[in-house]
């Protein structure tokens, strides 16, 4: 379904019918009813089951049609064999929303997928929206609507609200994450489990969360997506709305992707692909459930920006100081040495055995015997102009005695306080620090600094200009559909002849004899390159089908003859020998395009040449992509260091490279018959001298 609905009625239904409700203790349907009742749902609940007259003190109806009133939402908890018939009843009753927890549909194989599509056909014709199948429902914390099941709510006393909204394609993971966050004091606005996403999907709910005024941070567990370009649009919409999406992706490894396929029927893309798409969308990607909860906690509580994010550590242990320095480097945080002026002022307060540089090592003496000095030490560090974050690591027993004064000093200076002590602060102290909005509390030094890094990432995204840029710039040419050649892989000569009017490539012509080849070389000028051209001949270097550095007619004749001797072993139907002008040396990169059914068109960039598959230095984006998106790809790779000029080598023509990337992107989008398009290598010449695509593989 194309248009995302207003989900306000879904999250806050005036009436809910539970079809298939059971009186059996501990049943899934019974848990749905119990949680709705226990957490204070204010609307009408209609149990439906022909076997019962009454359920939990409520009248039970034999059929959905017997309910005398309108039903805003129907929860179907029947066996899967009865789900289709119940969906038909929902359509006849004009129920706008249906939730289907049952498994055994699209994730279970072709037969299940067929039934799932039948459910969707019914929903489409009746303008009904589905959540699931294979889901665990949802929770509206603001209105206390707990339409869910499972043990994750068993010991939750009340649905305390907050500013985090969560969506999970895995029901069990989502429930576990909600439970974990609630125990850590993180409050929610909404949580939904989307399951197979036959209709409404994670992006639909993210869009609703973005519009919700009470939601500041959106968390997501994603196994796979249907439309990468839409994910990018949703992520950017969130950033423009002042909100951030934190995402944990499951199914990154080959085995993980296989598990995703069996779990929900999705095809999971590689980690590299999703990493690039999340970056393009302005989402913060995390690597574990622990990181996810840490990011949600931090970003929901800290909502101000210090003057900078350079870290100064005040520690009572040399080991903690060493770790702080190491961790800052890993996390990309600046850890500057303090000025001589600050160090001189600190020397009268810091014990002789300590250190006044960064980290400031106050030793065990200050916490144990001179705790009254700590606020003054913190005050001096806060006055350091190039510092924005104060990382404090002392035993919690001592911090409990002075944290209010420390927080007041740090807050007054406009800095951010990060507490990274081993063990945990008392609950009240932790809550007070969190409530301030100017402090981060970590279980240890790493935890505290990683949380600082999350704030830095959010701030960096806030300053990105490409969020306001158009999604794609078509380049210098008005690209129209090119004539689609016959299916399969084009030869290099065919592909270059098709693309040469739009992209920078070496001049080249096809020769069938030594005489023709010499004539072409005389036209271009030496040196030249010779390549065998034949259908299916892709990796010419490995096949011995290319000759370089040919600088004379005699050398050309010899190389031509050697290639013709080689041809029967590597080329079936030989089209000839491609004679090209040889391009001077430069930085070699790869640029590729592909279409994935579950993601749409993608662009890939990285270090090129014959080692591309070995070093895997690549970055991805979804198409369409603007010039700034493409520039971000380039900056993410190791090749960018070479392009900027490495070890006295001249800087490469990055602007020329971006011109080619933009043109090629527009060409690929304008011609859906192109399944894959790869340029490897592209030689980036020194700044101002352009680029050349030396080899092309085009698959139709």
Model-identified regions with their sequence ranges:
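Catalytic-core regions of core metabolic enzymes
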Residues: 1-700
């Amino acid at each position: 379904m194309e248009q995302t609905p207003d989900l306000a009625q879904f999250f806050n239904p005036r009436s809910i019918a539970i079809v298939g409700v059971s009186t059996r203790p501990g049943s899934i349907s019974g848990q749905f009813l119990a949680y709705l009742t226990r957490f204070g749902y204010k609307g009408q609940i209609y149990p439906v089951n022909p076997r019962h007259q009454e359920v939990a003190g409520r009248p039970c109806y034999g059929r959905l049609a017997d309910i005398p009133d309108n039903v805003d939402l129907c929860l179907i908890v029947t066996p899967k064999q009865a789900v289709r018939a119940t969906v038909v009843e929902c359509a006849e009753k004009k129920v706008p929303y249906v939730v289907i927890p049952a498994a055994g549909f699209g994730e279970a194989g072709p037969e299940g997928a067929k039934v799932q599509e039948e459910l969707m056909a019914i929903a489409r014709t009746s303008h009904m929206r589905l959540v699931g199948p294979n889901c665990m429902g949802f929770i509206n914390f603001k209105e206390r609507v707990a339409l869910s099941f499972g043990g994750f709510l068993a010991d939750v006393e009340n649905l305390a609200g907050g500013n985090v909204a969560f969506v999970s394609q895995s029901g069990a993971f989502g429930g576990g994450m909600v439970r974990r966050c609630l125990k850590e004091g993180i409050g929610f606005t909404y949580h939904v489990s989307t399951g197979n996403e036959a209709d409404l999907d994670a992006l639909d709910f993210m869009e609703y969360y973005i519009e919700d005024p009470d939601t500041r941070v959106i968390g997501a567990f994603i196994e796979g997506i249907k439309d990468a370009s839409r994910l990018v649009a949703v992520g950017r919409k969130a950033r423009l709305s002042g909100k951030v999406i934190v995402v944990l992706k499951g199914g990154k490894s080959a085995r993980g992707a296989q598990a995703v396929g069996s779990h929900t029927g999705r095809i999971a893309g590689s980690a590299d692909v999703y990493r690039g798409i999340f970056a393009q969308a302005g989402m913060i990607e995390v690597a574990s459930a622990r990181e996810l909860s840490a990011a949600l906690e931090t970003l929901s509580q800290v909502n101000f920006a210090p003057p900078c994010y350079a870290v100064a550590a005040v520690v009572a242990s040399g080991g903690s100081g060493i770790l702080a320095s190491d961790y800052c480097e890993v996390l990309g945080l600046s850890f500057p040495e303090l000025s001589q002026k600050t160090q001189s002022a600190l020397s009268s307060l810091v014990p002789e055995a300590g250190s006044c540089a960064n980290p400031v090592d106050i030793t065990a003496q200050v916490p144990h015997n001179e705790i009254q000095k700590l606020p003054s030490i913190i005050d001096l560090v806060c006055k350091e102009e190039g510092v924005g974050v104060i990382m404090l690591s002392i035993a919690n027993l001592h911090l409990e005695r002075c944290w209010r004064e420390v927080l007041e000093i740090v807050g007054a200076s406009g800095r951010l306080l990060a507490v990274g002590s081993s063990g945990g602060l008392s609950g009240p102290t932790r809550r007070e620090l969190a409530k301030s909005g100017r402090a981060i509390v970590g279980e240890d030094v790493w935890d505290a600094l990683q949380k600082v890094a999350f704030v830095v990432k959010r701030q960096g995204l806030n300053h990105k200009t490409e969020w306001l840029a158009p999604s794609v710039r078509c380049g210098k040419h008005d690209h129209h559909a090119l004539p689609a050649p016959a299916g399969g892989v084009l030869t290099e000569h065919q592909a270059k002849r098709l693309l040469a009017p739009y992209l920078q490539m070496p001049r080249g012509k096809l020769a069938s004899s030594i005489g023709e080849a010499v004539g072409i070389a005389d036209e271009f000028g030496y040196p030249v390159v010779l390549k065998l051209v034949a259908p299916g001949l892709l990796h010419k270097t490995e096949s011995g089908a290319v000759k370089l550095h040919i600088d004379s007619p005699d050398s050309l004749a010899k190389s031509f003859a050697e290639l013709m001797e080689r041809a029967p072993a590597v080329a079936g139907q030989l089209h000839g020998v491609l004679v090209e002008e040889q391009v001077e040396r430069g930085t070699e990169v790869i640029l590729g395009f592909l279409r994935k059914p579950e993601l749409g068109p993608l662009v890939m960039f990285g270090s090129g040449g014959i080692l591309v598959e070995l070093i895997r230095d690549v970055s991805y984006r979804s198409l369409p992509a603007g010039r700034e998106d493409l520039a971000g790809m380039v900056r993410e790779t190791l090749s960018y260091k070479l392009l900027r000029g490495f070890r006295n080598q001249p800087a490469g023509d990055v602007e020329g490279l971006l011109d080619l990337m933009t043109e090629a992107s527009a060409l690929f989008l304008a011609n859906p018959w192109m399944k894959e398009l790869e340029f490897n290598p592209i030689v980036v010449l020194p700044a101002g001298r352009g680029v050349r695509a030396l080899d092309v593989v085009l698959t139709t």
